Amino acid sequence: MKSIFVSGSPRESVGKKDAKALRVKGLVPCVLYGGDEQIHFFANEKDFKPLLFTPETHTVELEISGKKYNAILQDVQYHAINDRLLHVDFLHVDESKPLVIAIPVTVSGIAPGVREGGKLIIKVRKMKIRALLSQLPDNINVDISKLEIGQSVKVEQLQALHPDLALLDAPNVAVVSVTATRASRQAAQDEGKK
């Protein structure tokens, strides 16, 4: 899994007035949870663009006053009107313990059912998984090259393909399916009448 580097500096004082002063300077107040202690720090707002404005999931390598921490993005707060970053929470990740994270689902191949007039529906865009930091994939790929109209790929089928990951979504949930469109149903009825 890709990692993004964010450099921060510790905050001396924590409070509404100080957080507002940081935001005026283009800095974002942040907190790192999950380690031995909570670390309050601030970072440049521009450092968060590759982390937030992407469909991909990344781990974060934080450097706060010379110390490095592995983390994941826990929560982001935006301003209600102008959509500027207000606050970012990070969760410290221990490399020896499994973590739960949402991984994007990608689709590869062309479904024969789509060529016959069906419609491809991606029902799950991100799947929750549990794995060690070193085993996290960039995405979960779904091969749809054998999907006919009315067929789907379920979580339990993907779990069989990825035995090293624990997929936390319900096993009977359809991730990707090909459904019949009105035009394809009409064509099938017309062919049946002949």
Regions found by a protein language model. Give the residues of each.
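Acidic, negatively charged sequence tracts
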Residues: 1-194
